[in-house]
């Protein structure tokens, strides 16, 4: 099979580039085509750093664009290893600028800006120059009667536009490479380190505190309830949630700490209540205050009234949830 010439490879690749297809397969074919062209250029030794741009044949000026076209195509790739793609593009952009510099094809505004205002001014100037070059290139491409002089001017203009575009693209590529490297380093660091990030640790600690503030841990060393679910020892549940709930849905008063029977028994022990056994009832007295004639139920009712008078609502024990 006869191998294709450099001109044939170039034209086939240019047709693919100008086609409406933008899928990854087509892009790969375009890159492959330009890489074959570049390989042939090196083999044929078409260019030399010792010659001037005027010494290059008009028909061969287009091949100075190969590195630029490779960089431009790969820069637009979105799938696969993005860092590898932008590094590839950066390498070919810089190679293109180096070749153009060797042949004296330098940017129109070559001075370096000193301030931010100078940078903005330079960008505006380059943008306007590029617009003028593109208009000139468009006019040259429409001319049906193209001679060698016009063709040469066409390719030199296209090279100048590519130089300006490269100078605009390189800062963005360098910034993207820096961001991608940082992201890659952070990813490797997180994969290598078993430690969790600070935000995750704070979130888990907060959840643990919220859970432990109201849950009763049944796995403690000492048992709390017996087989009949009766408490073996006093315990208190301290809870921010319960405190809040009590303030919102609470009784509005503090609950008593003992029953009426317990209160009466305690008063009897203290001697504040006279037992019927110690003082038999008198048969000739119908006084309502004679305790000896009152049965146990009446006595409890009276002392319950006394208890309520002595302990108004809201004056009892403030500790709740005791078991």
Curated annotation (Swiss-Prot):
Disulfide bonds: none annotated. GO terms for cellular component: cytoplasm; cytosol; nucleus. Signal peptide: none annotated. GO terms for biological process: regulation of dephosphorylation; regulation of TORC1 signaling. InterPro entries: TAP42/TAP46-like_sf (IPR038511), TAP46-like (IPR007304). Residues 185-214, 271-294 are annotated as: Disordered. GO terms for molecular function: protein phosphatase 2A binding. Belongs to the IGBP1/TAP42 family. This is Uncharacterized protein C63.05.
């Amino acid at each position: 099979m006869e191998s294709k010439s450099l001109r044939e490879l170039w034209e086939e690749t240019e047709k693919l580039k100008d086609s409406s297809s933008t899928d990854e397969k087509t892009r790969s074919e375009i890159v492959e085509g330009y890489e074959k062209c570049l390989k042939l250029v090196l083999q044929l030794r078409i260019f030399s750093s010792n010659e001037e741009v005027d010494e290059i044949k008009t028909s061969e000026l287009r091949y100075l664009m190969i590195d630029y076209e490779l960089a431009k195509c790969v820069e637009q790739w979105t799938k696969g290893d993005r860092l590898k793609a932008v590094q590839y593009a950066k390498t070919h952009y810089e190679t293109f600028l180096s070749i153009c510099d060797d042949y004296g094809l330098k940017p129109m505004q070559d001075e370096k800006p000193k301030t931010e205002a100078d940078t903005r001014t330079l960008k505006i100037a380059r943008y306007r120059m590029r617009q003028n070059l593109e208009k000139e290139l468009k006019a040259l491409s429409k001319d049906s009667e193209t001679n060698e002089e016009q063709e040469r001017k066409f390719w030199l203009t296209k090279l100048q536009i590519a130089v300006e575009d490269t100078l605009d693209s390189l800062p963005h590529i360098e910034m993207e490479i820096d961001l991608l490297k940082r992201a890659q380093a952070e990813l490797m660091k997180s994969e290598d380190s078993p430690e969790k990030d600070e935000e995750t640790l704070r979130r888990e600690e907060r959840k643990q505190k919220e859970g432990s503030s109201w849950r009763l841990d049944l796995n403690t060393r000492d048992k709390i309830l017996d087989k009949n679910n009766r408490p073996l020892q006093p315990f208190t549940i301290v809870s921010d949630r319960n405190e809040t709930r009590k303030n919102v849905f609470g009784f509005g008063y503090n609950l008593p700490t003992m029953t009426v029977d317990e209160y009466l028994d305690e008063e009897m022990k203290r001697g504040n209540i006279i037992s019927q056994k110690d003082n038999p009832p008198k048969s000739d007295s119908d006084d309502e205050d004679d305790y000896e004639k009152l049965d146990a139920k009446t006595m409890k009712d009276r002392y319950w009234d006394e208890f309520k008078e002595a302990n108004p609502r809201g004056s009892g024990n403030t500790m709740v949830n005791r078991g």
